[in-house]
Amino acid sequence: MKTCNLTDRMEVKMIMLLFQILAISTLKSDSADIPEGYIQENVALRGRATQSAQLRGDHSGIAHASNAIDGNRDSVFYHGSCTHTEADKPWWRVDLLQVYTITSVTITNRGDCCEERISGARILIGKHLENNGINNPQCSVIGPMAAGETKTFRCPQPMIGRYVTVYLPKAESLHLCEVEVNVLFPAPC
């Protein structure tokens, strides 16, 4: 039985990165399975969220950007676990606070209204905040989603980034009930 006795933090980080790359390269593009010896983790829970503009009016107090990374997939906006922006090319972004190799992003759509609004939104991943992260490379485009549906969007290849942005390039409000940023890590020794 092997034990983990590495003490040099940089060496450990480099080995973890190499394991992530190796694990990701063995995934089939249509496979939802996690390779043996690895765990998938939602790193968005550790992040900080922001959005272009928060909904104004009677329900503005429950429309915070951070609601989409609270770990709660409740899709009823009025329960206080969804975001809601104003209209006109809105965006929502999570700062993961460090760079990760990201394999996919899971989105939970609003379930009590307006499920069609999310269609056409782009998931962007990168290391830059230029244009609020909208200039970062694209992982996927969100197609039609059912009310309250949770769907995983796999990037064509693993993407390295600190910022994950959901951008809706039209004059419509954006609401997200959960955003999960999926990263593979070697299972603990």
Swiss-Prot record:
Ca(2+) binds at residues 67, 70, 72, 81, 177-178. One of its GO terms (cellular component) is extracellular space. Residues 1-31 form the signal peptide. Belongs to the fucolectin family. This is Fucolectin-7. Alpha-L-fucose binds at residues 84, 110, 117. Gill mucous cells. GO terms for biological process: regulation of cellular defense response; regulation of complement activation, lectin pathway; regulation of innate immune response. It comes from Anguilla japonica. Homotrimer. GO terms for molecular function: calcium ion binding; carbohydrate binding; fucose binding.
